[in-house]
A protein has these predicted regions:
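Short beta-alpha connecting loops at secondary-structure transitions
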Residues: 280-285, 541-552
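Flexible glycine/proline-rich, aromatic-decorated loop/lid segments
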Residues: 274, 512-545
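Extended redox/cofactor-interaction regions of prokaryotic respiratory oxidoreductases
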Residues: 169-256, 261-268, 292-296, 390-515, ...
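Long, well-ordered, tryptophan-enriched scaffold segments
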Residues: 259-267, 271-361
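N-terminal leader/propeptide and maturation segments of large enzyme subunits in energy/redox metabolism
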Residues: 108-132, 307-348, 436, 549-648, ...
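Active-site phosphate/pyrophosphate-binding segments
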Residues: 298, 319-450
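Long, contiguous, secondary-structure-rich segments that constitute the structural scaffold
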Residues: 549, 558-610, 683, 698-699, ...
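N-terminal export/assembly segments and adjacent metallocofactor-ligating motifs
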Residues: 2-307, 566-568, 727, 771-842
Length: 842
């Protein structure tokens, strides 16, 4: 049964706007509408006509509702630079991939945990009543805990989910499942897994999610900005909370200063990215995965030309004397000269020296992204960026130093003077029903190694200074999470998946993770429930009511109600809810911020006035801020969180771990595979980038049918390829191509462009896995999931993070029968099956 298509037709103007989303002009809009009063949540009922204020990862907006149907979306007037992705948000509610009903995989319904798990992915499901689905869920929780213990139950995989302080899918899952029993958890994430482990050792904090120096200060004080593997104009369209997009005004000012030659911007990137197109500047098209040789050569130049800051090195760092012998070749016989680096990086020695001199010749801000730490030995890049900033000696000064979060969460905006809201957290003081022993197995695992854990139970690995033993995972629960998008080496993952006895997915879109689940429960979208959220991420500009726009579609339920009903089955309903209804919790969250506001002089209206009124409060402006300023001004009183309190160029803690792939100081390690003359480039000559998309948030919005049509090529995810590489393969823009390596193959639509250096191609991550032969490892992906092609190995023994950007491929024009894209139509409904078949008794 298909969702009724109530979508309004997309005009040519809107269509072209979607096509142009990759350009900065389409990202940065103009001021919008005059304020309008939002409606109360109680009005969001069938037959309602009016406007509703709400928010999303893509910004705040007003939804026009006609006879209970959401028909139009208008950006919130407080957002000066809304993203075109707001056009796709309505389709999250209305699209063929909605999870409509509780569904059970057909063979699991027949045989329970003894089912033929090789059938997972064939997309054959049976609709069942909610009561039966939740009974199955509880039965499996009990069975796994009683049969194997907590180490066999994995309920730690969380991700972006949806905005809202109450309806956080991961929090709901952890709160509900932890009342039932302890489970295997995870550490780290896929975005910053390597950097977030190593940087606390080196710089004393995780750094990747931190607020950055205020842009006003940078624009006043900086001479040179080095953007290293980052594309903030593309990535700032989305936010962890509801972005206000005010930061784009700073990029407009930067573009003007670059144009007037007041600030120099240097982009170290093999791609002429959206930020470069928007702000201007110079490009150094470094070969992929060769940034460390380039950085070491810069360090060599700073040292040999006496351009480094000796006072800063002496007073704010430790270990420089142990690092420089490596740079000078005294430890391995290789002097890290610009000539040495040129052969690997493709950047001329003269350019490397000039770059070092430019960086040392004035105030320099190093702006690092996250892609470069998502490759094998990714820890080294994060470490080395801090080392270069230390050698320049400008850390803690206005407009100088380093930062790893400029492309994320409105970074560089001035944080308001307002309070912060809490959320719906875990339960304390209530003993779980099942609290068994882990029997020596790990209680947590590095998240990017969870498929390793499934594949190789009992294996011991090194991780961040400890040895852990993978448990025998038997059941996995995913709520608002799509590992069949963000994990690497899809075919390896499919093979591992057969070892799981039961998989539960709680979702509102029928993702590939649902296809490979046994129990699928339909959740509401953000737009079918009431909630509250912060407007602006680092800016904390205000508080926004997230009002229900339409009634829940089909049989979807809020995550709150799903886990409340599950907890009722084991007598923990009141512990889960805290004895409160959903709106009472939202009011409690608001009142907590209101009380906090009183203490800092910020007056807020009562919750009733807020919710029934405009549904938006704006906080007073805060003050400008310089990252690491307190450390620079008073290093003894404000030390970093490292072992020494200083920046650790050489880290004894890491050295003492004894890892050969992450030693006591930053080093160059060759990769398993690398383009431009590296390993396996003779077989697969093209480096595959799988960066964050400019049309989605990871895999979110990929199911928005009309919006997807504005950027697909030949109905597939685009692959961007250099003109020389395309000509050598007789490929033109618009061609359907096969992208392949030894791990798998995908179809994609070619976009031939000079923006990409020779030997470099890109498919944005988050493209939905759409197998030709569902559930079969090795089958071609009909839409273009890049993680069919990526390598699933840890960055090193330190972080064990994802190495997605260590991947080489080849491309050819596709000449076979053209298959339909399989990924966006929901499940195959099997009928004639008794929906009350007692699989739990098997």
């Amino acid at each position: 049964m298909a969702t009724q298509n109530n979508h309004k037709g997309i005009t040519r103007r809107r269509f072209l706007s979607g096509l142009a989303i990759a350009s900065a002009a389409s990202v940065v809009g103009t001021s919008l509408l005059a304020p309008r009063k939002a409606m109360a949540a109680t009005d969001a009922i069938t037959g309602f006509n009016g406007e509703v204020l709400c928010g999303s990862h893509w910004g705040a907006f007003r939804a026009k509702v006609v006879n209970g149907v959401w028909t139009e979306t208008t950006p919130f007037e407080k957002d000066p630079h809304p993203t075109v992705m707001l056009d796709a948000v309505r389709e999250v509610v209305y699209n063929p991939a909605r999870v409509k009903y509780p569904m059970i995989r057909i063979d699991w319904l027949k045989q329970g945990y003894k089912s033929d798990t090789s059938q997972r992915g064939n997309n054959r499901f049976v609709r069942v009543p909610w009561s039966q689905a939740l009974d199955f869920f509880q039965h499996e929780l009990n069975r796994v805990q009683e049969t194997y213990g907590p180490s066999a139950l994995y309920a730690g995989h969380t991700g972006w989910q949806s905005v809202g302080k109450l309806h956080n899918a991961g929090t709901m899952m952890k709160r509900g499942i932890s009342l039932h029993g302890t489970t295997l958890g995870k550490m780290g994430d896929y975005s910053t897994g390597a950097a977030q482990v190593i940087l606390p050792y080196i710089a004393g904090a995780m750094e990747v999610y931190e607020q950055q120096t205020s842009w006003d200060i940078v624009l006043k004080n900086t001479d040179t900005i080095v953007m290293w593997g980052t594309d903030p104009v593309k990535n700032l369209q989305v936010g962890w909370l509801v972005p206000d997009h005010s930061v784009y005004g700073s990029y407009q000012q930067l573009a003007e200063k670059v144009k007037n030659k007041e600030i120099k911007v240097i982009h170290i990137d093999p791609v002429r990215n959206e930020t470069m197109k928007f702000v201007g500047g110079e490009q150094l098209p470094v070969h992929p995965q060769s940034d460390i040789p380039l950085m070491l050569a810069i360090a060599h130049t700073l040292y040999t030309e006496n351009l480094y800051n000796k006072d800063f090195i002496a007073n704010y760092t430790t270990g420089f004397d142990k690092f420089m012998p490596y740079v000078m070749g005294e430890t391995d016989g290789i002097v890290k000269t610009p000539e040495w680096a040129e052969k690997i990086s493709g950047i001329k020695a003269s350019q490397i020296r000039e770059l070092a001199r430019t960086m040392a010749g004035g105030r320099t801000q190093l702006v690092g992204g996250w892609c470069l730490q998502r490759m094998q030995h990714g820890e080294q890049w994060a470490w080395m960026l801090v080392v270069l900033a230390a050698m320049l000696g400008q850390i803690g000064q206005p407009g100088g130093g380093f930062g790893f979060g400029w492309h994320y969460n409105d970074a560089g905006t001035i944080t308001s003077a307002g309070p912060l809201m809490s959320g719906f957290s875990g339960v304390t003081g209530v003993e779980p029903i099942y609290n068994g022993s882990f029997k020596g197995y790990a209680k947590t695992i590095p998240v990017a190694r969870f498929v390793d854990c499934i594949s190789n139970p009992g294996t011991k690995i090194q991780w961040n200074g400890s040895e852990i033993t993978f448990p025998y995972m038997k059941m996995a629960i995913f709520s608002g999470n799509n590992p069949f998008a963000h994990h690497q080496d899809r075919n390896r993952m499919i093979k591992a998946w057969t070892k799981l006895e039961t998989v539960v997915s709680i979702e509102h879109q029928w993702t590939a993770t649902c296809r490979f689940a046994d129990i699928v429960l339909p959740a509401t979208t953000t737009y079918e429930r009431d909630d509250i959220e912060q407007f602006g991420n680092h800016s904390n500009k205000g508080i926004l009511a997230l009002r229900k726009i339409v009634e829940p579609m089909f049989e979807s339920k809020d995550d709150f109600d799903i886990f409340r009903e599950l907890c009722a089955r084991f007598n923990r309903e009141e512990a889960f809810t805290g004895g409160k209804k959903k709106m009472e919790i939202i009011e409690e969250i608001y009142n907590g911020a209101r009380l906090q506001g009183r203490g800092i002089g910020v007056r807020m209206p009562t919750f009733a006035k807020f919710w029934e009124g405009d549904g938006y409060i704006e906080f007073p402006a805060g003050k400008e801020w310089v990252r690491h300023e307190s450390f620079r001004n008073e290093p003894d009183l404000e030390p970093l969180g490292t072992a020494s309190g200083l920046i650790e160029i050489y880290c004894k803690t890491i050295a003492d771990m004894g890892y050969n792939d992450c030693q006591g100081h930053p080093m160059w390690f060759e990769k398993e595979e690398r383009s431009h003359g590296g390993p396996r480039s003779d077989v697969y000559p093209l480096h595959l980038q799988s960066c964050h998309p400019n049309n989605r948030l990871h895999s979110q919005l990929c199911s928005s049918t009309d919006f997807r049509a504005t950027y697909t090529v030949a109905d597939r995810e685009p692959i961007y390829i250099n003109t020389q590489d395309a000509a050598a393969r007789n490929i033109k823009s618009g061609d359907l191509v096969r992208v392949f390596n030894g791990r798998g193959q995908v179809l994609a639509g070619a976009v031939v462009t000079e923006d990409y250096s020779p030997g470099v191609c890109r498919i944005h991550e988050g493209a939905w896995y759409s197998p030709l032969d569902g559930g079969k490892a090795g089958t071609i992906c009909t839409y273009g999931d890049p993680n069919v092609l990526t390598l699933d190995i840890g960055t090193s023994q330190l972080a064990q993070a994802t190495s997605a950007h260590t991947a080489v491929v080849d491309i050819e024009k596709y000449t076979g029968p053209v298959p339909e894209v399989t990924g966006f139509n929901g499940p195959t409904y099997e009928t004639g099956i008794d929906p009350l078949f007692p699989a739990m008794d098997k």
